[in-house]
Amino acid sequence: MIQSQHSQTARHALAETVVLAKARKNLSFAQLTEGTGLSEAFVTAALLGQHALPVDAARNVADKLGLDDDAVLLLQSIPLRGSIDDRVPTDPTIYRFYEMLQVYGTTLKALVHEKFGDGIISAINFRLDVKKVDDPEGGSRAVITLDGKYLPTKPF
């Protein structure tokens, strides 16, 4: 039976347990994703409390981390989503994304509407990918792909 969370408390606590177990076992999110049939971004988001995992994926990850049956059930529950409090993020990495949206949010909105019309980009029918590439000028660059289905506004 599908279960749904009414608060973020249980999933936040499980996320803390997951991060600690991951560190103790010296595992990467890529290693935890292996054998799930899902993307690294989706599994990572699920382990951090933002998605529900299918039963087989939940068991696979729980076995790798040494989590109990209650954790397997909780990993399958639909979370109350949203990881940023109702304030400006203070973590430097998350803040940079916030800053990007502050600077480019209206540009993204204008370009999406110009190319697609009135509507939104889905965060449900969505894919996320993060790649590290060499910068020709030295160092590394982050290539982040946000791939969401366009959903038009429908007059009623």
From Swiss-Prot:
The active site is at R96, E99, S122. Gene3D superfamilies: Cyanate lyase, C-terminal domain, lambda repressor-like DNA-binding domains. It catalyses: cyanate + hydrogencarbonate + 3 H(+) = NH4(+) + 2 CO2. One of its GO terms (molecular function) is cyanate hydratase activity. It is an enzyme of class 4 (lyase). InterPro entries: Cyanase, Cyanate_lyase_C, Cyanate_lyase_C_sf, CYNS_N, Lambda_DNA-bd_dom_sf. It comes from the Bacteria. SMART domains: Cyanate_lyase. SUPFAM superfamilies: Cyanase C-terminal domain (SSF55234), lambda repressor-like DNA-binding domains (SSF47413). GO terms for biological process: cyanate metabolic process. Disulfide bonds: none annotated. CDD domains: Cyanase_C (cd00559). Coiled coil: none annotated. Keywords: Lyase. Its EC number is 4.2.1.104. Belongs to the cyanase family. NCBIfam families: cynS (TIGR00673), PRK02866.1 (NF002773). HAMAP family: Cyanate_hydrat. Catalyzes the reaction of cyanate with bicarbonate to produce ammonia and carbon dioxide. This is Cyanate hydratase. It comes from Burkholderia lata (strain ATCC 17760 / DSM 23089 / LMG 22485 / NCIMB 9086 / R18194 / 383). The lineage of its organism: Bacteria, Pseudomonadati, Pseudomonadota, Betaproteobacteria, Burkholderiales.
